[in-house]
UniProtKB/Swiss-Prot annotation:
One of its GO terms (molecular function) is protein-macromolecule adaptor activity. The lineage of its organism: Eukaryota, Fungi, Dikarya, Ascomycota, Saccharomycotina. The keyword Nucleotide-binding does not apply. It comes from the Eukaryota. Keywords: Chromosomal rearrangement. This is Increased recombination centers protein 6.
Amino acid sequence: MIPNHILILGSPNSGKLRIANLISRNEEIPQLEDAESHSGLIIKTSLRTKYYFLKLNILIDEYLESKETPDESKLSELHKWYQEFKSEEFGELREVLDGLMFTINMKTDSISFIGEALEIIEQIKLSLGDEESFHNWGGFIAVVGSCPVNQVVEDDVVLEIEDMVLSHGLEFINLSTEGENEYKEKQGKDRIVELVESHDWTNLEMVKVDSKQYEANKLAKIESMKHKLINEKEELDLDDIFKKLNLARDHASSLTQNEKDKYANKIIDEIIDFL
């Protein structure tokens, strides 16, 4: 089977291996010393859900070698990385990528640096795909904010970073969280897994579904929805649904048409699950 590819890009100590661990479920991850560079690391793994099976290569790269680097130097190195990435030499890699995760250290990266880095990430996004799909790349991009173990980032800093990322039309994921938020949306570690598993992958094998089991599951879902609709003790929280729709509409306004279609299907599925 032809493998799919995602790229995790970031500076040292920004959560790249933690993300790879989540995606691969801690399989095939080499034991690395803190001092070792992660540039060029390739983790070969696989994903299996109840719907599909696929092979996945997780590519990890760094744009500088030192953890203690001034913002100007970090931006310069990130820009150099982008210039190399968009060259003809890396054309084949750009064509096969299904996803990109850019990692930041919310404790050590300044707000100024993050803002400038997001401008470069936007340029990287525009370079992805082949000539026929120019500006309409079907992959996913997420900016993942991490924090060193046993350290805490203030809530107002996290919110400021999230607002900056969203203003660039990108998704922000806080690696320090997990579970669901107040709108029943996956967040943090669970959102990373959901983002990967719900993607429309280029190369996969569909899992054969037993027709009788499928019908049984569908009937059970219908009965559950019917029960909630008629049982006064389990009222539906319509306010939560409307809030979710409004947030989804705001987020979709910055997406391409292809991204809007995929995002709309995802939201519909989430609302059905919520019901």
